[in-house]
């Protein structure tokens, strides 16, 4: 009779963590930075169909690095959770802290108890407040750990190199133009040869507290970004402005402008992947954590 093969729990967790880190390291970096009027998200992303940065709710936004199909499922689950909580209680009860904790519970459970592979994702959830002191940001790792964002946070494979550059150039309560230029410069120096990133290689959005609409999320269009960075845009005229994000869509984000009222919650298909079931195991039917 052969002896059963044994692997210690410590070795299993170590192998799963190494697997997840390798997957995340292949993703392009995203920076989440606080500035004087809110929070800006800057990521290297040449695709116009697949977003790394999205709106979750009125004052909440989401950024991710890693495997796209996995963090897109998490985004959809977050939108559904926020919509349900805002509908059952009040829109003001939808907070970044609650959403970050929900993501942490789901990712932690899937990492430690899941029979399949761990999720190769790293997330950031940010909430803009009425004043700069009220702004909040949270980083959620593949194993469910949550840390506060202080000033700025970089996600993705080149996070260490980009963070090192940003540490030397970041200014607290700086203007958007200053923060954007520092972020783009840092993303271009990600440990390889220094690169100059063009506006069409970037995805940029802000949570801006000065907006009169309930929804504070705003995408920065390519031409507006070119003006902020002081470079020439590739197309369109001076009249093209920034675009809004229809984050309630299950797929890519639809642009819309001039929206003054928050949109009605939209349904999410039932087959969005196992992660939706994992989140539902943590949340009750009314969108609140179940009692243990």
Swiss-Prot record:
Notes on how activity is controlled: The formation of the proteasomal ATPase ARC-20S proteasome complex, likely via the docking of the C-termini of ARC into the intersubunit pockets in the alpha-rings, may trigger opening of the gate for substrate entry. Interconversion between the open-gate and close-gate conformations leads to a dynamic regulation of the 20S proteasome proteolysis activity.
GO BP annotations listed: modification-dependent protein catabolic process; proteasomal protein catabolic process
Record's keyword annotation contains Acetylation: no
Domain of life: Bacteria
GO cellular component annotations of the record: cytoplasm; proteasome core complex, alpha-subunit complex
Pathways involved: Protein degradation; proteasomal Pup-dependent pathway
Keywords: Cytoplasm, Proteasome
InterPro entries linked: Ntn_hydrolases_N (IPR029055), Proteasome_alpha-type (IPR023332), Proteasome_asu_bac (IPR022296), Proteasome_sua/b (IPR001353)
SS bond partners: none
NCBIfam families: 20S_bact_alpha (TIGR03691)
Function: Component of the proteasome core, a large protease complex with broad specificity involved in protein degradation.
HAMAP family linked to this entry: Proteasome_A_B (MF_00289_B)
Protein name as it appears in the record: Proteasome subunit alpha
Species assigned in the record: Catenulispora acidiphila (strain DSM 44928 / JCM 14897 / NBRC 102108 / NRRL B-24433 / ID139908)
Gene behind the chain: prcA
